[in-house]
């Protein structure tokens, strides 16, 4: 009796496995990088982000130039004091020379402290700008990738594909159809992208 149960279970397992293996699977490939690069909304998104961040970037560039100009002016100021001291040194007493050197050192230290503060503020603004820019780019990139995923899913369901794989992650495949262009064509363009065409 045990043998009959084993043979029946084995036969049933083989029948199920062969039936599953013989089911036709349709496999398709897409080049996700190509689709992303040629997405109908990609340029509109890039233009939108550029318009959003260009004024801030220009303001930061102007602020950096202002800081650089202040650094140059501070150096010139200290260098002028040093040059004046060198010129006057032969006529001055040693105590007067030391006093003026201390004044120059104090002036240099005060200028350095002020400039360090300005540079730190500038660096903080730049870091905040970069973080905000990266966040917005990630948000917009996510929207584009979502639309690619939706278009791929819809096309795969409509055409009856069992699997859709990224062609860049496949080492070898015996069969499959490249549906990259079909997916790209099925992505609806936003109104802004259509206006640019």
Swiss-Prot record:
Upper taxonomic lineage: Bacteria, Pseudomonadati, Pseudomonadota, Gammaproteobacteria, Pasteurellales
Q: Give GO cellular component annotations, separated by semicolons.
A: cell outer membrane
Answer whether the UniProt record assigns the keyword Membrane to this protein.
yes
Q: Which family does it belong to?
A: Belongs to the Skp family.
Query: Which keywords describe this protein according to UniProt?
Result: Cell outer membrane, Membrane, Signal
Q: Which SUPFAM superfamilies match?
A: OmpH-like (SSF111384)
* InterPro entries in alphabetical order: Chaperone_Skp (IPR005632), Skp_dom_sf (IPR024930)
Question: Which molecular-function annotations from GO does this UniProt entry contain?
Answer: unfolded protein binding
| Alphabetical list of SMART domains matching this protein | OmpH
What Gene3D superfamilies does UniProt report for this protein, alphabetically? Skp domain (3.30.910.20)
Indicate the secretion signal residues. Answer: 1-23
Q: What is the effect of changing residue 157 to R?
A: In strain: NTHI 289 and UC10
Please state where this protein is localized: Cell outer membrane
Report the protein name in the record.
Answer: Outer membrane protein 26
Keyword flag Nucleotide-binding: no
A Pfam family cross-referenced in the UniProt record is OmpH
**GO BP terms:** chaperone-mediated protein folding; protein stabilization
């Amino acid at each position: 009796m045990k043998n009959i149960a084993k043979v029946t279970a084995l036969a049933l397992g083989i029948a199920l496995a062969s039936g599953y293996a013989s089911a036709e699977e349709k496999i398709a490939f897409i080049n996700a990088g190509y689709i992303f690069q040629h997405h109908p909304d990609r340029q509109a998104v890039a233009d939108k982000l550029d318009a959003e961040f260009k004024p801030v970037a220009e303001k930061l560039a102007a602020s950096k130039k202002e800081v650089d100009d202040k650094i140059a002016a501070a150096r010139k100021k200290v260098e002028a004091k040093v040059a004046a001291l060198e010129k006057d040194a032969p006529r001055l007493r040693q105590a007067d020379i030391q006093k003026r050197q201390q004044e120059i050192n104090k002036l240099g230290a005060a200028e350095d402290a002020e400039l360090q503060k300005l540079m730190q503020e500038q660096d903080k603004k730049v870091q905040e700008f970069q973080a905000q820019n990266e966040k917005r780019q990630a948000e917009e990139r996510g929207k584009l990738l979502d639309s690619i995923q939706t278009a791929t899913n819809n096309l795969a369901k409509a055409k009856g594909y069992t699997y859709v794989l990224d062609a860049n992650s496949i080492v070898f495949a015996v069969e499959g159809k490249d549906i990259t262009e079909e997916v790209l064509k099925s992505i609806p363009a936003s109104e802004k992208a259509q206006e640019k065409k």
